[in-house]
Amino acid sequence: MDPRKIQLPREIYTGPGVIEDTGRICRDLRFEGRAMVVTGPRTLQIAGEAAIESLQAEGFEVDQVTVDDATMASVRNVQDGLDGVSVVLGVGGGKVIDVAKMSATLEGLHFISVPTAASHDGIASPRASIRNGEGTASLEASSPIGVIADTEIISRAPFRLLASGCADIISNYTAIMDWKLAHRLLNERYSESAAALSLMTAKMIIKSADAIKEGLEESARLAVKSLISSGIAISIAGSSRPASGSEHKFSHALDMIAPKPALHGEQCGVGTIMMMHLHGGDWQFIRDALARINAPTTAAELGIDPEYIIEALTMAHNIRRERYTILGDRGLTREAAERLAKITEVI
């Protein structure tokens, strides 16, 4: 087997108030000089200003840029300001983190992830979801050298974001089943350790589902730890296989066709219900777990017309065709897709 490099975060800080240690953490990681802080329009005030103040208190010169969307145009905009910068910090939600991560990767710089919400597993993964003209592409990037997850800030984010992140973790169930299937049928490289870590995080979320409540710092801490663990599983595997299978293909298809897609994790959760049925597994178990964390389980709860659910199911196999899943090479007919969505009570 060819040698592979596994990139993992060197420092992970979670807990209330850790945003105030941003400057010291960067010093401990041997950074100096200029730092770039990437934020969203809202997250600058929520956490960006605190991170900047902490950096300046440690003697850093700080540049700041605001991004509105996760596009290559946003990535290039950040890149334009990275001359002389020693470290890039992404302070915000998934889009901000992905843009900061991708721009740092392209410039060969280290990146620190500072999430303000626990909405998906990109917090610590070596992947970035960047939108292009044909939808959203999952691009290879460098893992963050550090993660600073202030659970007090994250607990104040809309609960829908945290529930979406938990649903994204629960979707690891079918991602692992798809990966095992590809290993058996196509001899695709499979990592027992990455799969075990990914599945463990999903089981941990489901086991603790009744304790995941709005506004609780403990709930934010649990979700963040699970999302970070899932991201590390991706790093170990060298691909997003441990956390992305047929359910993610379904979500990406919805992103392409639905007039107003739901959150990424929400769509993946609903996709997991249906893909678990295709695998012959306990789809009701998945549905009930999602319901316990107040994540959507139906098209109506996603706010998406049933017609788009059916269409997304029929086209999902064409997303990343090199990634074999339970959908196979030919996918589902319209009749099979409609039947699947009705049997699982998604529509």
Swiss-Prot record:
Needed co-factor(s): Zn(2+)
Residues annotated to bind NAD(+): G94, K95, V96, I97, D98, T116, A117, A118, S119, S125
Catalytic activity: sn-glycerol 1-phosphate + NAD(+) = dihydroxyacetone phosphate + NADH + H(+); sn-glycerol 1-phosphate + NADP(+) = dihydroxyacetone phosphate + NADPH + H(+)
GO BP terms, alphabetized: glycerophospholipid metabolic process; phospholipid biosynthetic process
pH-activity profile: Optimum pH is 6.6-7-4. Activity decreases gradually at pH over 7.4 or below 6.6.
Superkingdom: Archaea
Stored InterPro entries: G1P_dehydrogenase_arc, G1PDH, Glycerol_DH
CDD domains, per database record: Gro1PDH
Pathway: Membrane lipid metabolism; glycerophospholipid metabolism
Temperature dependence: Optimum temperature is 75 degrees Celsius.
Known regulation of activity: Partially inhibited by divalent metal cations such as Co(2+), Cu(2+) and Ni(2+).
Molecular function per GO: glycerol-1-phosphate dehydrogenase (NAD+) activity; glycerol-1-phosphate dehydrogenase (NADP+) activity; metal ion binding
Keywords recorded for this protein, A-Z: Cytoplasm, Lipid biosynthesis, Lipid metabolism, Metal-binding, NAD, NADP, Oxidoreductase, Phospholipid biosynthesis, Phospholipid metabolism, Zinc
Binding site for substrate: D121, D168, H252
Co-factor binding details: Binds 1 zinc ion per subunit.
Residues where Zn(2+) binds: D168, H248, H264
The enzyme's E.C. designation: 1.1.1.261
Record localization: Cytoplasm
Subunit and partners: Homooctamer.
HAMAP family: G1P_dehydrogenase_A
Role played: Catalyzes the NAD(P)H-dependent reduction of dihydroxyacetonephosphate (DHAP or glycerone phosphate) to glycerol 1-phosphate (G1P). The G1P thus generated is used as the glycerophosphate backbone of phospholipids in the cellular membranes of Archaea. Is also able to catalyze the reverse reaction, i.e. the NAD(P)(+)-dependent oxidation of G1P but not of G3P. Is not active toward glycerol, dihydroxyacetone, glyceraldehyde-3-phosphate, glyceraldehyde and glycerol-2-phosphate.
Protein name according to UniProt: Glycerol-1-phosphate dehydrogenase [NAD(P)+]
Gene: egsA
